[in-house]
Design a protein with these regions (language model features):
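C-terminal output helix
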Residues: 106-115
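Conserved acidic carboxylate
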Residues: 7
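Acidic, metal-coordinating helix/loop segments flanking the phosphotransfer/catalytic sites
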Residues: 30-48
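The feature encodes the CheY-like receiver
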Residues: 56, 86
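Two-component/phosphorelay signaling modules centered on CheY-like receiver
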Residues: 10-29
């Protein structure tokens, strides 16, 4: 199985990928464009989606809405990671189908715990130790 990170900033994508690797051995795929990421989701099922909101082509919210229309993604956790701190965005994201919401800059321990909790494979005490 694999995790899909949809993030157009290469530095942010690298940081998120590095943090996720601390708690999973799953393949991690990075896509910089929402439309291309949506095409990937049509072709395969990811175990988790980590999505920025500000993307070229379509917003993270538009991406989530489109993914949630695919029945095979009904139970797949989607984490939105964005620099936008507006409470309105958080509410809209949850209403759209986002499972969890983190703001940038990402706090490493909280991010690793969130990923581990959703993947169900790494106890919280191991997350802090990695």
């Amino acid at each position: 199985m694999a995790i899909l990170i949809v993030e157009d900033n290469p530095t942010n994508a690298m940081i998120i990928k590095h943090l996720a690797r601390k708690v999973t051995h799953e393949e991690i795929v990075v896509e910089t464009d929402g439309g291309a990421a949506l095409a990937l989701c049509h072709g395969r099922v990811f175990t988790m989606l980590i999505v920025d909101n500000m993307l070229p082509g379509m917003s993270g919210l538009q991406f989530v809405k489109a993914v949630r229309l695919m029945q095979r993604y009904d139970d797949v956790p989607i984490v939105m990671v964005t620099a936008d701190h507006e409470p309105r965005l958080r509410a809209e994201a949850v209403a759209t189908g986002v499972t969890d919401f983190l703001t940038k800059p990402v706090e490493a321990v909280a991010f690793r715990k969130l990923v581990a909790d959703h993947l169900g494979g790494v106890p919280a005490d191991m997350v802090a130790a990695r």
